[in-house]
């Protein structure tokens, strides 16, 4: 099972960080998961190095229960490998 970490930056912003396979569908699947919940990221950063895609997504204004649920769902995306 893969894992995603949700790091609180402050009381209203959550940062999700994960490593994934360098596949064209990984980032769109992560963003689609947010869009289906009506969430718009404040910041998205992705960098491919060799065979790993490092992704950081920040979202503002999430309740803690929602933040935890989104993190679990991101970890279930095919191609997501691990927390960094």
Predicted regions and their residues:
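A conserved regulatory-domain signal marking ACT and ACT-like small-molecule sensing domains
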Residues: 1-84
